[in-house]
Structures are given as C-alpha cells and as structure tokens.
C-alpha cells in the first residue's frame, strides 16, 4: 500500500500556557495510538507533536490510506446446539448466520474448535480494513475527549444554536494525507481542509494554504511567521536570551528558570527577546522580591551578574518583531515600575515594625482547625527545637573536653538562646505585607527583617533557612541553629499531621509530608547529626498535649520508607537497602557508611554462603523464642561447634572494635572469615539436640553468631 505522511492541526483561540506542552503531547499521542490500534500505521511510523498558543498539531510518518483486510473468527455456539443429529443446521444457527450476512450454504465452511468444555462452531470471514478518513475521525474524537484539561469551555458554533465543549473555541481543522485533504473528517463542528492561519500580526500570507503534510512546519515559519514546534521555539528563546545577555556584557546572565521558559514558550509564536531596564534605586529592595514580581507577574527574565546579584536590566520575550522596538521596550519598562514600586513600599512598611512585635498576631492566624493557630504552632516548634538543641549539644559534648566545660556551658546557652529566638520569630513574616502579597517569600523575608532588627546572623539565617530543603536538591540550612529549627519545624508538621490522621494517600499529599520526611532525612544524613530518630519523635509528641494521638511508630515507618526510596534512587539494590533498613537504624547519619559496607560485603566470595547461613540462623532463633547468647564451653562436644566458638572468640572482638570506630566495611570483612566454621557447623552439628542443655547451648552459640553478624545490617536479606 501507498504510505504517506499525515498532518492534523486543530486551530484554536489562545490555549492555557501552563498546560500547552502537555496538551500538545497528549493530542498527538492519542492520535498515533488510535491509528496504530486500527492498523493504519507502519512499524516505523514516527510522531512529531506541535503546540503553539493557537494550535495543536501532529505529524505522523508512513500512514496507510486504508488498513489491511484481516481474518475475523467469530464464536457462534456449541456444535450440539447448532447442528441436529443428522448434521443439518438448526434454526438457532441459521438465525445467527443470517445476522452475519451468511446462509446455510456456509455451514460446511464453519470451523470446529474444542474450547475445553465442548466442540464449538466458529464463523470465519475477512473484514475490510478501516479507511484512513474513518480511522482518523475515530482517533480525532478520542484525542479531543482525552485532552488532560480539568476545565473546558462551552461555546456555540457558527450556526448559532449548536454548542460544543473544548478547552478553547476551535476555528480550523487541517487533515492532510500527503497532499490530499481527508474529505469528511470533522471535529468540533469544523470540516477538515488544508488552510490555517499564521501569526496574528506578522504573517506574510493569510490564510496559509498547506501544500502537504511535510511542508506544514516550514510553511508556517516562512509564510505564517510561526515556529510551530514547542521544542524548537523553546530552544530559540533560550538562544536569544543568552545572545541578549551577551550584548549587555559584563558577564551578566539570564536567570535560570525552566518553568518560566516553558511558560513564555507557550505564550509566543514568534519570539523576539528585548533588553529593558528599571531604575537602580529599586535594587535596595531584596532581590528575591524584585525577581519574583518580574517573573510571576510580567514573565520577564531578570539579569544576574557573575556573583548572582540582580542587575537593573531584564529581558522581555516579545511576540512581535517591529523594525523599531523602542515603543515595546518603553511599554514594558513602564509596566514594571509600579510592580517594583509596590515591592519597595511593602518592604519599607514592613520594616517599621519589628518581628518581635508581630508575634502576638500569629494567635489570630489559623494553622489547622485541629491543631490551632500559628501562635500555638510556634510554641510547639520552640518546645521541640529546645529538646533537639539539648540532644545535639549533649551528643557533641561527649568526648569533647572543650564543650564539656564552663566554656561549653556558655556555648550551649548561646545555642539554646539563638534557637529559641529563631523558633519564636520564624513564622512572623507570615503577617507582613510582603509575604501577604508573595507567599513564596516566607522565610526569606523573615531573614531580611531579622537583619533589619539587628538580630544575630545565626538567628537571621535560621529564620530564612527553616523551610529548607524546600525541594529535591535544595540547599540545607547553613548553621546548627538553622538545622535545629528546620528539624523542629518539619517534625512539628509530621507529628501533628500523623497525630490527627492526615496521612498522604496515593498522589495526594496536601501538607507535603513526604517532602518534610525527606528533609529530615537529608539534614540528619548530610549534616552528620548524632541524633537518634526515636528520640527526636519522642521529644516532639509532648508538645501537642492532648491534641493528637501518639503515632510515633507509624511515623517512623513512614520515614524509613522514604529513606529506603531515597537509597534506591541513589542506585543501591533492593536487597542492600532492605538489609540496612531492617535494623531500623537510629542514627540515620550512619546509614551511608552502613549501606556502603553492605555493598562491599556483597562482593566477597563468602557473602552468599554467609547470607544464606544467616537466614537459616534467623529462622532457627525465631522458632526457639528467647535465647540466651551465653555459651558453656564444657558443653561443646562436636569439633565443628568448638571451631565456630573459637572463631567467634577470636574475630568478633576485632569486628566489634571496627564497628564501634565506625569502620563498618572492615567489620563485615573481618567476619567474612566465619564462612568455613559456619558451613562446617551446619554440616556436622545437630542444633536441636534431644538433650536440653546441648540444644540450649547450641542455640546460644547461634545467637552469639547472629548478634555478631547483624550489627551493621540484617545480612539474611542478601540471601537469594
């Protein structure tokens, strides 16, 4: 059959920019999927999706004008029902055949197949393959129905009385197979043709008559002044942004923001990047405020210098390319000034009140109807932060003479004071004008206002950092004060929400509990904090009084699940992760070394046998119940059990010393020498001896082995 390339375009009014790329991919993807299902494509068909503010389109290679005919086998009825005793068709069979367009003459051609219960009659025929126009009609209907958009518009067609529903009103439909229009294809009250429209203002030809499916993109670019491909348009904008920054000079660069680049790509069809500027006086306002208002409200790209500081220049992606762009530049500069002036006004007004003076206002801000106000929340965070700071200082002071002294007490008092001040003030920027206008700046503005109030740097940094990490890969708080307050804030959220039953379900996680749990894990691990997980959770629960149930065990499971997922994402195998997590390690800071030790152990020749033996030991001890690890040497009778005991006495102290020093890899490698005596023990010794004393002694020996082998991880999880 004659393969030709297919082009389908739906020309519409301006589509929602944040959804455009997803809409384009979905529209094209469903078209291809439906055509494939109907046998209208080849094995080598390729899809290209197009999406611009006013069009969704798909180009599919090697599309057939009609699908191949195919044999169809239809089950009729059991032979006993369809044929009488003399082999003649029954009325039931004749009626069924008539419905299929056949008669008694076709009875000899019926196929008999045994389906496991009885012999059944099948009618075989050739079904005509679907014509492309019919197949595309079905595919187009499906693609329109399945567009991933939560809200659609209802609008009237040109006849004045028919209403249709779509994301935006549609005004044109192109359907070309090669250069031929697929006559009869319709969608949303439109009939397919070969004409579309280019840029509203800059098209050199209107309408654009598409000559063939393959000329679509080039004709739109040359005649319609439109870059139809989302990816090509995005790349062109990125190129122009960098070129404009290079023209400005001084090492400036446009802000790196993929979401903004995607949104701007969805707003223009012919991008033209222009350099604009604002008054330098506005740079006295925190740059986060200026950057956010330019990005969020105006879709501008701020320019940063080599040190990441905001400059007074910014880039605009225009949808028109006039010979003299001065009017466009001046218009954008005029529009941005009031936005920046508002930000400056908010900043100046907010600094007229100190953060401390705003604390009482938090009592009027509802946090959650079951957990009270932000004011109550602040008191809980203070309670938890104090407990964490005390635990942290105590752990750091162990073996540190400088901290375990009068100077250490002064340092502890300073830490506790800074932590308490930061926890008290961390949420106060929620009642400032700036954060009221830009909620994304919470924490950040608190840090600026703390500096303005003359608070210590540690407190200001902690207020700014206490929401960190906000997302995967985000920076962690800079100093211990910030880490403590950030931990307290996240634990307050986790313990509180779990305590009232607000758990994540499926894709729903409105309080970002998964992100909070990962934040706790990252801080404990990456900051190498000597803090125990259960102790942290235990310190948080009392802060809530009788408002919540104690769900610490359930929350710990949740955190370990997040930790396991994080480790798997880092490339560790499920067995390696299970081996470490099975012990529910309290010091999460030690987990990276533990799992690396397990990985190294798993490469040893002795590992499979020891893992299998460990699994066997685990099962034996589980059945035995409570087992005393004490071994009476006088009751050791068999050479194999004596050898195992001697090996344990010789190598376990060394392995334990290595474990206690934190060298987990060396500890496991030291224990690898136990393979031979362990194998011999299971070959030659009856653990469940009839004599009770012997049985208990041998169980005790295995308990001793089990305790030695499983300090780093549950090695039985490595057994295949």
Curated annotation (Swiss-Prot):
Ribonucleoprotein is among the record's keywords: no
Sample GO molecular function, one term: arginine-tRNA ligase activity
Q: Mind telling me which GO cellular component terms the entry cites?
A: cytosol
Compartments annotated for it: namely: Cytoplasm
Q: Which domain of life is it from?
A: Bacteria
Listed EC numbers: 6.1.1.14
Cite the Pfam families for this sequence: DALR_1, tRNA_synt_2f
Q: Which InterPro entries match?
A: DALR_anticod-bd (IPR008909), Gly-tRNA-synth_bsu (IPR015944), Gly-tRNA-synth_heterodimer (IPR006194)
Under HAMAP family, the record lists: Gly_tRNA_synth_beta (MF_00255)
Describe its partners and assembly state.
Answer: Tetramer of two alpha and two beta subunits.
Question: PANTHER family attached here?
Answer: GLYCINE--TRNA LIGASE, CHLOROPLASTIC_MITOCHONDRIAL 2 (PTHR30075:SF2), GLYCYL-TRNA SYNTHETASE (PTHR30075)
According to UniProt, the name of this protein is: Glycine--tRNA ligase beta subunit
Question: To which species is this protein native?
Answer: Acidovorax ebreus (strain TPSY) (Diaphorobacter sp. (strain TPSY))
């Amino acid at each position: 059959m004659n393969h030709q390339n297919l082009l389908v375009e739906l020309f519409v009014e301006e589509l929602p920019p944040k959804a455009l790329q997803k809409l384009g991919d979905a529209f094209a993807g469903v078209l291809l999927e439906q055509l494939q299902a109907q046998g209208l494509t080849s094995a080598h068909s390729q899809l290209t999706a197009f999406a611009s503010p006013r069009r969704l389109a798909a180009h599919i290679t090697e599309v057939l004008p009609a699908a191949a005919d195919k044999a169809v086998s239809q089950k009729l009825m059991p032979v006993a029902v369809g044929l009488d005793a003399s082999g003649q068709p029954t009325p039931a069979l004749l009626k069924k055949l008539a419905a299929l367009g056949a008669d008694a003459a076709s009875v000899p051609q019926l196929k008999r197949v045994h389906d496991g219960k009885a012999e059944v009659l099948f009618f075989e025929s050739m079904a005509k393959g679907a014509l492309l126009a019919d197949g595309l009609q079905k595919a187009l209907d499906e693609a329109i129905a399945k567009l991933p958009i939560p809200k659609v518009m209802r609008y009237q067609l040109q006849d004045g009385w028919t209403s249709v529903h779509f994301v935006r009103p549609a005004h044109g439909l192109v359907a070309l197979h090669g250069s031929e229009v697929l006559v009869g294809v319709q969608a949303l009250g439109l009939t397919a043709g070969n004409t579309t429209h280019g840029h509203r203002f800059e098209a050199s030809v209107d309408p654009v008559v598409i000559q063939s499916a393959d000329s679509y993109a080039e004709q739109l670019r040359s005649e319609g002044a439109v870059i139809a491909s989302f990816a090509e348009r995005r790349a062109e904008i990125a190129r122009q942004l960098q070129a404009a920054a290079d023209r400005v000079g001084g090492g400036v660069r446009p802000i790196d923001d993929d979401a903004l680049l995607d949104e701007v790509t969805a707003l223009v069809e012919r991008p033209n990047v222009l350099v604009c500027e604002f008054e330098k006086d506005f740079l006295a306002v925190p740059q986060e405020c200026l950057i956010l208002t330019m990005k969020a409200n105006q879709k501008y790209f701020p320019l940063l210098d080599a040190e990441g500081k905001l400059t007074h220049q910014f880039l605009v992606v225009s949808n028109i390319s006039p010979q003299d762009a001065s009017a466009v530049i001046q218009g954008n500069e005029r529009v941005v000034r009031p936005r920046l002036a508002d930000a400056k006004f908010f900043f100046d007004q907010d600094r007229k009140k100190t953060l401390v003076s705003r604390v009482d206002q938090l009592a009027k801000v509802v946090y959650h109807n079951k957990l009270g106000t932000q004011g109550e929340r602040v008191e809980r965070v203070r309670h938890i932060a104090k407990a964490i700071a005390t635990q942290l200082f105590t752990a750091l002071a162990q073996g540190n003479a400088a901290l375990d002294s009068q100077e250490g007490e002064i340092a502890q008092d300073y830490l506790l004071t800074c932590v308490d001040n930061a926890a008290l003030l961390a949420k106060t920027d929620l009642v400032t004008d700036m954060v009221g206008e830009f909620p994304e700046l919470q924490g950040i503005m608190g840090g600026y206002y703390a500096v303005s109030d003359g608070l210590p740097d540690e407190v200001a940094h902690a207020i700014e950092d206490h929401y960190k990490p906000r997302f995967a890969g985000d920076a962690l708080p800079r100093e211990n004060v910030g880490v403590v307050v950030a931990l307290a804030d996240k634990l307050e959220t986790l313990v509180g929400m779990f305590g009232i039953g607000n758990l994540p379900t499926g894709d729903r996680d409105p309080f970002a509990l998964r992100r909070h749990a990962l934040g706790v894990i990252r801080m404990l691990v990456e900051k190498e904090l000597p803090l125990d997980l259960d102790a942290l959770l235990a310190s948080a629960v009392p802060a809530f009084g009788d408002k919540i149930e104690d769900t610490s065990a359930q929350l710990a499971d949740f955190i370990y699940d997040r930790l396991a997922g994080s480790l798997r994402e880092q490339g560790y195998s499920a067995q390696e992760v299970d081996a470490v997590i099975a012990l529910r390690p309290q010091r999460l800071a030690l987990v990276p070394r533990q799992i690396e030790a397990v990985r190294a152990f798993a490469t040893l020749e002795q590992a499979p046998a020891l893992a299998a033996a460990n699994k066997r030991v685990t099962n034996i001890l589980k059945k035995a119940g409570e087992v005393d690890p004490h071994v009476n040497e006088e009751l050791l009778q068999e050479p194999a059990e004596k050898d195992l005991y001697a090996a344990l006495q010789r190598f376990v102290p060394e392995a334990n010393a290595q474990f206690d020093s934190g060298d987990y890899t060396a500890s496991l490698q030291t224990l690898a020498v136990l393979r031979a005596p362990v194998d011999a023990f299971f070959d030659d010794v009856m653990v469940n001896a009839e004599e009770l004393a012997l049985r208990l002694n041998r169980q005790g020996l295995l308990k001793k082995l089990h305790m030695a082998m499983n300090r780093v991880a549950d090695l039985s999880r490595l057994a295949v």
